[in-house]
Amino acid sequence: MKVAAAFLLAVLGGNANPSADNIKDIIGAVGADVDGESIELLLKEVSGKDIAELIASGREKLASVPSGGGVAVSAAPSSGGGGAAAPAEKKEAKKEEKEESDDDMGFSLFE
């Protein structure tokens, strides 16, 4: 992922065809390690392709992947007494807000 991010940073920075050394420099600037094999693989896969098309293709693929949201939805209706728990949580949240607002300590940052 860091190799792809460094590649995109180079492209967004104006380098239409970043080299392996450019990507190594970007990753090295943040103190991360990188292996040359993953850089070469990425450069081979994206050579001659438009970055905007690659991003659009990736979005389509991610949209087709099922997310974990379906599991939570099917689990929620199975509990019969689930409706009573929700108001208790709201009351606790209100109490916490009051406690936080009482932490004035007698001074203001803007005075």
Curated annotation (Swiss-Prot):
Q: Does the keyword Phosphoprotein apply?
A: yes
Gene Ontology process terms (BP): cytoplasmic translational elongation
> What organism is listed for this UniProt entry?
Arabidopsis thaliana (Mouse-ear cress)
Q: Which GO terms describe its molecular function?
A: structural constituent of ribosome
Recorded hits in HAMAP family, A to Z, give: Ribosomal_L12_arch
- Chain's role: Plays an important role in the elongation step of protein synthesis.
List the Pfam families hit by this protein, alphabetically. Ribosomal_60s (PF00428)
The subunit field of the Swiss-Prot or TrEMBL record says: P1 and P2 exist as dimers at the large ribosomal subunit.
Can you tell me which family this protein belongs to?
Belongs to the eukaryotic ribosomal protein P1/P2 family.
* Comp. bias intervals (Basic and acidic residues): 88-98
Q: Please give the residue ranges the record annotates as the region Disordered.
A: 63-111
Protein name per its UniProtKB record: Large ribosomal subunit protein P2w
